[in-house]
Design a protein with these regions (language model features):
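N-terminal Rossmann NAD(P)H-binding glycine-rich loop of SDR-like oxidoreductase domains
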Residues: 4, 12-32
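N-terminal Rossmann-fold cofactor-binding loop
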Residues: 39-44
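NAD(P)H-binding glycine-rich loop region in Rossmannoid oxidoreductase-like domains
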Residues: 45, 60-98
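Active-site segment of SDR-like NAD(P)-dependent oxidoreductases
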Residues: 84-85, 122-129, 180-183
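Conserved Rossmann-fold NAD(P)-dependent oxidoreductase catalytic core, especially the SDR/UDP-sugar
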Residues: 101-151
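NAD(P)-dependent short-chain dehydrogenase/reductase
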Residues: 130-131, 161-213, 218, 222, ...
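Active-site helix of classical SDR
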Residues: 155
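Mid/C-terminal beta-alpha module of Rossmann-like enzyme folds, strongest
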Residues: 199, 224-261
Length: 261
């Protein structure tokens, strides 16, 4: 990875801040001397204080309903991680596609210096086992068979289309990063699979093993943001986003079994 200066002294909105990926990132950016706003629905007011304690201000937004009144003015950067997982396509499109474009529109109307980072997913690719994906590869509906995610791939594709269109129309420098498998010290597929193993629940794998991914740790997610932003342009550059090692579900389950007995 090229050397890129860390982000500091900026006014930043991080959406989906209550999620696994965006939360640690918002906390890290606040610690680097940025003014950080963490956005989520925050239906429970008590959810806000822990973020304030970490130096992250909170704003309430609802992408599906178009509730964006609290989006701050004069932002330098939006890091858009909010995502909805729904069995209903209309609900998924409202949040992941229309909501993403609306967010850019509102933020850009309130700032003349905005850059936009849109977190997409490698779930947008056509199902093709065992082959590395390039950003130009065919798109598809790979996550439809997964429990609770029948609309995920298609709505994330729709989100990319609308974000790309809106960036070009408004002239907002944008990068679309297709995230592979994120994990941290206390979250991610590995933790989930360990809990399944402890309960003797079979871990699903591809019929043609090994089931490989390129996992990326929270620390590397945080460190890679400035580099990815260097690709932002009004054409909304698309980049794959993962770790630099191929690792399979079979491998990490075997290793966790060895470590835990």
């Amino acid at each position: 990875m090229s050397s890129v200066e860390q982000i500091t002294g900026k006014k930043i909105l991080v959406t989906g801040v209550t999620g696994w990926v965006a939360g640690p990132l918002a906390e890290s950016l606040a610690a680097q001397g940025n003014t950080v706003y963490g956005a989520a629905r925050f239906k429970d007011p008590d959810q806000r204080q822990p973020w304030h304690d970490k130096g992250v201000q909170t704003v309430s937004i609802d992408l599906a309903k178009g509730n964006l009144d609290e989006v701050p003015a004069d932002l330098d950067l939006v890091l858009h991680f909010a995502v909805a997982k729904s069995n209903n396509f209309e609900e998924a499109f409202a949040s992941n596609a229309h909501g993403s474009a609306d967010l850019m529109e509102v933020a850009a109307a309130r700032s003349d210096k905005l850059s936009f980072f849109h977190c997409s997913s490698t779930a947008v690719y056509e199902p093709k086992h065992g082959e590395a994906r390039k950003e130009t590869d065919l798109l598809g509906d790979s996550h439809r068979p997964m429990p609770g995610m029948p609309t995920y791939s298609i709505s994330k594709i729709a989100g990319e289309v609308l974000v790309k269109h809106t960036a070009k129309r408004l002239g907002v420098p944008t990068v679309i990063a297709r995230l592979n498998v994120p994990y941290g010290d206390a979250y991610g597929w590995m933790s989930f699979h360990l809990m399944m193993m402890e309960r003797n629940i079979p871990v699903p794998v591809h019929v043609d093993q090994p089931t490989t991914y390129t996992p990326i740790h929270a620390d590397d997610i945080n460190r890679s943001i400035p580099y990815l932003l260097s690709y932002a342009n009004t054409g909304a550059e698309i980049v794959n986003w993962g770790g630099d090692q191929l690792v399979s579900i079979e491998d990490w389950c075997e290793e966790m079994g060895r470590l835990t007995g």
